[in-house]
Regions:
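Cysteine-nucleophile amide-bond enzymes
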Residues: 14-268
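Short, small-residue-biased leader/transition segments that mark boundaries at the very start
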Residues: 1-13
């Protein structure tokens, strides 16, 4: 007898499970269950202390502004829209001139034990808001702050709109670092020419594997919330980032591009 008849139901079953998972789902971690779930996924790949620090930042944010329609349990992910004005006024009422944390601060908090950071000179000119937040929120000690500034240093580049050339500069810079294979840093790199041509990590988050795909964790901006998004594949996550940040450019500038750890992700 042929093995095919027995195989058939499995493949259809697999397909239907797979189909269900294709659509991304997201949470703002505004519930115990979602935060615990994400925490346990992150803990498989990251230092406990890092995950604890991150969890505390999430709790502080959601306890302060969670009432502004932030989601708890994972729900189908489409374009999200947040009431930044309302969030800002709630945040400021509680925290005064500490503006909170952003994508870079949270990514460093999670990955700091997992990336070997070279002791090289950094250009932290564009990190002025981050530095103000780190200072007012007493977020990092001097060593962490120095490493943070090296990881997200501005990188010199040329006056061109050719992404390949910029990506090469970024890859060369990140060759000095050792990244983690499992807990990956996904960055959206932006070309800037206000003060000479340079590259800058305009947005960043952490991608980890799950049993049936990937989990991407990000804090959108200082004001905007945390998002944990479940994707079926890395490529889906790259696409999300490429689409969301495609307008972070200007006349004569290259379009933003994605780095996965130290490597350029060529989307073309």
């Amino acid at each position: 007898s042929t093995p095919y008849p027995t195989l058939f139901p499995y493949t259809t079953l697999f397909r239907s499970i797979h189909k269900k998972e294709e659509k991304p789902s997201y949470s703002n971690l505004n519930s115990k269950a979602s935060l615990n779930e994400v925490r346990s996924i992150l803990s498989k790949h990251l230092d406990k202390g890092s995950v604890d620090n991150f969890t505390n930042l999430v709790r502080d944010y959601n306890d302060t502004v969670g009432s502004v329609g932030l989601s708890g349990d994972f729900a189908p992910f489409s374009k999200t829209d947040y009431d930044v004005e309302k969030i800002s006024s709630l945040w400021t009422a509680k925290h005064g001139d500490f503006i909170g944390t952003n994508c870079r601060i949270n990514t460093y908090t999670l990955l700091k034990g997992k990336i070997k950071i070279p002791q090289v000179k950094s250009d932290s000119e564009l990190l002025f808001q981050d530095k103000d937040a780190i200072d007012k929120g007493k977020l990092f000690d001097a060593k962490d702050q120095a490493d943070f500034e090296i990881l997200f240093s501005r990188v010199k580049t040329e006056a061109t709109q050719d992404v390949k050339i910029h990506a090469k500069h970024m890859e060369d810079y990140y060759k000095q670092f050792t990244f983690d294979d499992k807990a990956r840093m996904l960055s959206v790199v932006v070309h800037d020419n206000l003060d000479g041509d340079s590259l800058f990590v305009g947005h960043v988050g952490v991608l980890v594997p799950t049993t049936d795909g990937y989990l991407f964790v990000e804090k959108l901006t200082f004001e905007e919330p945390y998002q944990a998004i479940k994707f079926a594949s890395k490529k889906d996550c790259y696409k999300y980032l490429t689409t969301k940040y495609k307008d972070y450019t200007g006349p004569g500038l290259a379009k933003p591009f994605i780095m996965d750890n130290g490597k350029w992700v060529d989307m073309d």
